[in-house]
From Swiss-Prot:
SUPFAM superfamilies: Ribonuclease H-like (SSF53098). This is Crossover junction endodeoxyribonuclease RuvC. One of its GO terms (cellular component) is cytoplasm. Coiled coil: none annotated. It comes from Nitratiruptor sp. (strain SB155-2). The lineage of its organism: Bacteria, Pseudomonadati, Campylobacterota, Epsilonproteobacteria, Nautiliales. The gene is ruvC.
Amino acid sequence: MNILGIDPGSRNLGYAIVELNNSHMKLIEAGLVKIKPSEFQYQLSQMIEGLDMVFSSHSVDEVAMEDIFYAYNPQTVLKLAQFRGALALRIIQLHGNFSAYTPLQVKKALTGKAKASKEQVAFMVKKILGIKKEVKPLDITDAMAVAITHAQRLRLKR
């Protein structure tokens, strides 16, 4: 089963496809859709086109997306919410449904602590998926973490 993990951001869209086979997880692909600075509607379009490319190049059985987090800047929260809404609509159109996890849920699922740092999460992602090299930027490891969180939830449901 292939799980697509998505980390939407205001500048980039991190994505990761993790294969879940019984209790074993394997990274299939991970990457970043870079959003070029431009007017907002063009940024939305870039993000959706990037998501479309991921769906067209891989078989996806489950989709999980990180929920937006609180930010001090209201404009940032608004922009992230609009990006997430556009992504949610496109995922529903292409796939039918998705699961959402808050950053705290993801951190707790991977490290056991809801207040874990991004570096602690990245360490656990690499350990779980058997990745030896450093993964940058953290948008990519966040997407991997979302996919792993969803895989763990699916295993618990069985």
